Design a protein with these regions (language model features):
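Serine-dependent protease modules
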Residues: 1-11, 15-279, 283-286, 295, ...
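Conserved PDZ fold ligand-binding element
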Residues: 86-87, 299-335
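Extended hydrophobic-aromatic, low-complexity segments
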Residues: 267, 300-302, 309-314, 361-364, ...
Length: 375
């Protein structure tokens, strides 16, 4: 990304650990609840915060981690089921040699890591807890969450103990960066205070159901400034199913790197009209530009090409193919491409419309592969 474009983004995205359904096996049950009926959500109605905390607080845990590389650290988590599975963030347990959890009752239990997925910042740990200790939370539907709805965040900020903060859903469908720099789609943005140690704790709606896993903030100062993000619970559901079943997560992959700025944004940044971009540089009116194609990857096999680079009003821009449509949906940015790929699975066939600069659109079909560990 050029300095011109990179300079437009000044906030830091900070991962906040703290330093210093049925899964198919027949023996694991995850509590889920249907979305509220139309008119039930978005009006601020629902149980008071104290009631939500009383209902859900016992299912939230502190996660304590020790490693020779990073020393002691920690975060939060919540009980998923009565078999002892606990959800937290991957960055909380990354590199951990010893993991333990502290329940709200004060009971401490050793935990083992079942699996981690850096691409979604989700990890699953497991405890062998005594009967009556585990109080699973109920999972909601993050796709039904609306801007303005009240939310409650519970966790262990700054290691002071399980605490509650409140706010609203400030935005939905936000793309955020995972620990491995992949994009997590559809994050829930909130102004509920999220501080070091909150990572891995639940973001709950007014009914006390989990709609996200608190993960990071955007900040220019390094402290909380009212912009926090939670991994959407629908993404978490898919990940934990795979972790429980196989201990790993498989992601779709087509083998392209995309220029972060879409054609529409490029026009705004350069001061050129879309017509000028078309006449002078052969670019279509909308789309996402391919900067690189992985050798031997699905996109290369389908005939999609990356390219060199040329300057447009001082901004270095790739000269690769432009993706204008995927699966019948218009594409306007790299995030649109990422969202389609993230929602696919290996073996799926994706129909794309691509344009090489100065040429007519063409249709290609890409067979989704398995994302390599080093991709």
């Amino acid at each position: 990304m050029s300095a011109v474009i990179g300079g437009l983004v000044t906030a830091l995205f900070i991962l906040f650990g703290m330093s210093g359904f049925e899964d198919g096996s027949g023996d694991v049950t995850i509590r889920e609840v249907s979305p509220p009926a139309e008119g039930e959500s978005g009006d601020g109605a629902g149980p008071p915060v104290r009631e939500v905390y009383t209902q859900s607080g016992p299912g939230v845990v502190s996660v304590d981690v020790a490693s020779s590389e990073f020393g002691p650290s920690g975060g939060s988590g919540f009980v998923l089921d009565e078999q002892g599975h606990i959800v937290t963030n991957q960055h909380v347990v990354e590199g951990a040699e010893d993991v333990s959890v502290r329940f709200a009752s004060g009971v401490r239990e050793d935990a083992e890591i079942v699996g981690e997925d850096a691409s979604t910042d989700v990890a699953l740990i497991k405890v062998d807890a005594s009967e009556g200790i585990l109080e699973p939370l109920t999972l909601g539907d993050s796709d039904s969450v609306g801007v303005g709805e009240p939310v409650v965040a519970i966790g262990n900020p700054l290691n002071v103990g399980i605490s509650v903060t409140t706010g609203i859903v400030s935005g939905v469908g936000r793309p955020i960066k995972a620990p491995n720099d992949y994009t997590i789609d559809d994050a829930v943005q909130t102004d509920a205070a999220i501080n070091p140690g909150n990572s891995g704790g639940p973001l709950l709606d007014s009914r006390g159901t989990v709609i996200g896993v608190n993960a990071q903030i955007a900040s220019e100062s390094g402290g909380f400034e009212g912009v926090g993000f939670a991994v959407p619970i629908n993404t978490v559901k898919s990940v934990v199913r795979q972790l429980i079943t196989t201990g790993e997560v498989v992601h779709g992959y087509i083998g392209v790197s995309m220029f972060p700025v879409g054609i529409g944004e490029l026009a705004a940044y350069t001061g050129l009209s879309k017509g000028q971009l078309a006449d002078e540089y052969g670019l279509p009116e909308n789309g996402a530009i391919v900067s690189e194609v992985a050798s031997g990857g699905p996109a290369e096999e389908a005939g999609i090409e990356g390219g060199g680079e040329e300057e447009i009003e001082g901004i270095p821009v790739p000269t690769g193919d432009v993706v204008t449509e995927m699966e019948g949906k218009p594409i306007s940015s790299a995030d649109d491409v990422i969202e389609v790929v993230n929602s696919s699975k290996p073996g799926d066939r994706l129909a794309l419309t691509v344009v090489s600069p100065g040429e007519e659109p063409r249709r290609v079909e890409v067979t989704v592969g398995v994302r390599p560990d080093d991709a």
